[in-house]
A protein has these predicted regions:
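Hydrophobic, aromatic-enriched alpha-helical segments typical of multi-pass transmembrane helices
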Residues: 2-236
Length: 236
C-alpha cells in the first residue's frame, strides 16, 4: 500500500464522521422501534388474534417497519466507515468483517417491510362476506409470510457475529480503537454466536433479542468511537 493511501484526507474525515453518526442514529432508531412495539403494538396471543387486530395497529406497524429499515441502512453506512478506519492497519479482517456486516444488514433489510404482504392479507380477512373457511386460510397465509420474515431474521443474525468477530480482531491491531474496544467487540461477537447456536436449535426462542441488542450496543459505542476519530487525529 502506498504511503499516500495511509494519509487522512478531508474526505476520509467526512466518511468517518458521517459513518459514525449513521451508526449512532441507527441504534437510536432501533430503540425507538422497540418502544413503538411495546407501547403501540403489543404482543398478541396468536396469529389469528394478530390478523384480527391488524387494522388497529397498521399505522404503528408501518411506521415501526420504516424506522427499522432506515436503521439497517444507516448501519450499512457505519460498516463502510469502519472499514475505512481499520483498513490501513488490518486490511484483511477489516474487509471481511465489514462485508459480512453489510451482508447481514442486507438480509435483515430484506424482511424489514412485512406489512407489504400482511396488509393485503388483513384486508381480505376483514372484507365483508369473508367466510370462516376463507379467514382460516388467510391466517395460514399470514403464518407463512411471517415464517419467511423470521427465516430472514435468523439468517441475518447468524451472519452478523462472524463480522463482529473479524472487526474486533481488526480493532485489537488498530491503536485508534485500542485492544480494550477490540476485545469487547470480540466478546459481543462471541456472545451473539452463542445466542445463534441456541436460535438455530430453537428458532422460536426469544434469545434472538440478545442478538439485536448486541448489534445496538455495537453500533452505538463504535459509532461514537468512529465519529471521534478525526477530532482525535487518529485517522489511519
Amino acid at each position: 500500500m502506498a504511503i499516500n493511501d495511509l494519509q487522512p484526507t478531508h474526505e476520509d474525515r467526512r466518511v468517518l464522521r458521517w459513518g459514525g453518526l449513521a451508526g449512532i442514529l441507527g441504534g437510536v432508531l432501533l430503540i425507538v422501534t422497540f418502544v413503538i412495539v411495546g407501547a403501540l403494538v403489543g404482543i398478541f396471543a396468536g396469529p389469528e388474534a394478530e390478523v384480527a387486530a391488524y387494522p388497529d395497529v397498521q399505522v404503528a406497524r408501518t411506521f415501526e417497519n420504516g424506522l427499522y429499515l432506515l436503521a439497517l441502512v444507516l448501519w450499512a453506512v457505519h460498516f463502510i466507515a469502519l472499514y475505512r478506519a481499520l483498513r490501513a492497519t488490518s486490511p484483511a479482517p477489516a474487509l471481511y468483517g465489514s462485508v459480512l456486516g453489510i451482508m447481514s444488514t442486507v438480509v435483515l433489510a430484506a424482511g424489514a417491510l412485512p406489512h407489504v404482504v400482511t396488509a393485503p392479507i388483513s384486508g381480505l380477512y376483514h372484507a365483508p362476506g369473508a367466510t370462516p373457511e376463507e379467514r382460516a386460510t388467510l391466517v395460514l397465509a399470514w403464518q407463512a409470510s411471517q415464517s419467511i420474515i423470521d427465516s430472514l431474521l435468523i439468517v441475518g443474525l447468524v451472519i452478523a457475529p462472524i463480522g463482529l468477530l473479524l472487526l474486533g480482531v481488526a480493532m485489537v491491531q488498530t491503536p485508534a480503537f485500542g485492544r480494550g474496544v477490540g476485545r469487547v467487540t470480540i466478546g459481543l461477537g462471541a456472545a451473539r454466536a452463542a445466542a445463534v447456536v441456541v436460535l438455530l436449535a430453537i428458532p422460536e426462542s426469544p434469545i434472538a433479542a440478545v442478538g439485536i441488542f448486541a448489534l445496538i450496543a455495537f453500533h452505538l459505542v463504535l459509532g461514537w468511537r468512529t465519529f471521534r476519530l478525526p477530532a482525535n487525529g487518529l485517522v489511519g
